């Protein structure tokens, strides 16, 4: 197989023009329309010959009996890596991104708003992962008694994410006991704020240490606090995916086939698969583009992911992405994802300082 460096100027120019046309029209591109839309200096016969060569090299393919050709995943990859000229987001797009980052009252609203905004700006699916538990530990707990042995646990993470979990206990805790347990556990959490070990391991060690110290007046409360902590943290610490606009794929001609569309939507429903894809971006310093099979997003072809990490300071918390057809407008989507990740990171820092 030829590499990008082995293509001559004529082959590169024709491939670039064809990919751009296919992204714009969604229709297989023939030589004559290509010549009419671009100022190519070669004859129709030459263009047809070069297109045939590019097909033989694996950069183009000819669907069915069509007279035109479309890019393969290899063709898209070459285009994105070596030919693409990204353009900065428009002032209107930039303003919408900045307004979201400045106006979000809390981290949860920021995450949800980001997924919706990415969908709105790109017209593809917007996807955002909530901060990872490893990077965003629990910093405060609150217990609310609902019934004798049912407790609502309110978690507040270091980034300000608030989540609720219902815990069923095998014993009864009075509201005053729950308040004392929360105060005790929060004191231990704050003391371990910079520790590398998970919250539950730190809490368990601290509680057992206090119990061994024979603080008899607190012994019963500490036993209950230990059980409460174990059950609470067993229900917490799950990275989540927020998505908006999955159905936008159904507007693309590539997904007009019902079986293919169903397979794609099943892929969106498999949150673990999505997390595996997006977690590959956590160690990156910039936008990452996964084209087609590279993404492992779903069991169907023609899906690409443009993703970037976001964080607070030098700590990466999660990932945001646009998921769309391989025929997406990369020149527009890549800078949108990049700017959004940077603005959301700044907003997280501001929310953290404000909290």
Curated annotation (Swiss-Prot):
InterPro entries: GAF-like_dom_sf, HrcA, HrcA_C, WH-like_DNA-bd_sf, WH_DNA-bd_sf, WHTH_HrcA_DNA-bd, WHTH_transcript_rep_HrcA_IDD. Pfam families: HrcA, HrcA_DNA-bdg. It comes from the Bacteria. Keywords: Repressor, Stress response, Transcription, Transcription regulation. The keyword Glycoprotein does not apply. GO terms for biological process: negative regulation of DNA-templated transcription. The keyword Repressor applies. One of its GO terms (molecular function) is DNA binding. Negative regulator of class I heat shock genes (grpE-dnaK-dnaJ and groELS operons). Prevents heat-shock induction of these operons. PANTHER family: HEAT-INDUCIBLE TRANSCRIPTION REPRESSOR HRCA. Belongs to the HrcA family. This is Heat-inducible transcription repressor HrcA. It comes from Anaeromyxobacter dehalogenans (strain 2CP-C).
């Amino acid at each position: 197989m030829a590499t990008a460096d082995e293509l001559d100027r004529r082959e590169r120019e024709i491939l670039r023009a064809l990919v751009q046309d296919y992204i714009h029209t969604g229709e297989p591109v023939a030589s004559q329309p290509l010549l009419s839309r671009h100022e190519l200096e070669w004859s129709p016969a030459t263009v047809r010959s070069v297109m045939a060569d590019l097909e033989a090299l694996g950069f183009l393919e000819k669907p069915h009996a069509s007279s035109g050709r479309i890019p393969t995943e290899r063709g898209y990859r070459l285009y994105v890596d070596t030919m693409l000229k990204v353009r900065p987001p428009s002032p209107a797009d930039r303003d919408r991104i900045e307004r979201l980052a400045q106006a979000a009252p809390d981290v949860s609203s920021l995450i949800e708003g980001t997924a919706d905004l990415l969908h709105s700006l790109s017209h593809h699916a917007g996807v955002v992962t909530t901060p990872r538990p490893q990077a965003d530990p629990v910093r405060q707990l609150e217990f609310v008694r609902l019934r004798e042995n049912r407790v609502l646990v309110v978690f507040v993470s270091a980034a300000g994410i608030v989540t609720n979990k219902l815990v069923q206990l095998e014993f009864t805790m009075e509201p005053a006991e729950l308040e004392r347990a929360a105060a005790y556990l929060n004191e231990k959490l704050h003391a371990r704020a910079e520790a590398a070990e998970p919250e539950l391991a730190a809490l368990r060690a601290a509680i057992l240490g206090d119990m061994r110290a024979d603080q008899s007046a607190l012994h019963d409360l500490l036993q209950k606090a230990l059980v409460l902590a174990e059950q609470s943290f067993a229900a917490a610490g799950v990275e989540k995916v927020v998505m908006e606009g999955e159905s936008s794929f159904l507007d693309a001609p590539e997904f007009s086939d019902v079986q293919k569309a169903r397979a794609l939507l099943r892929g969106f429903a498999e949150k673990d698969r999505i997390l595996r894809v997006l977690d590959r971006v956590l160690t990156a310093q910039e936008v990452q583009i996964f084209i087609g099979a590279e993404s492992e997003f779903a069991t169907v072809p023609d899906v690409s992911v443009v993703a970037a990490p976001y964080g607070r300071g030098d700590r990466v918390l999660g990932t945001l992405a646009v998921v769309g057809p391989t025929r997406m407008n990369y020149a527009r989507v890549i800078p949108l994802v990049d700017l959004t990740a940077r603005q959301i990171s700044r907003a997280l820092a501001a929310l953290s300082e404000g909290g």
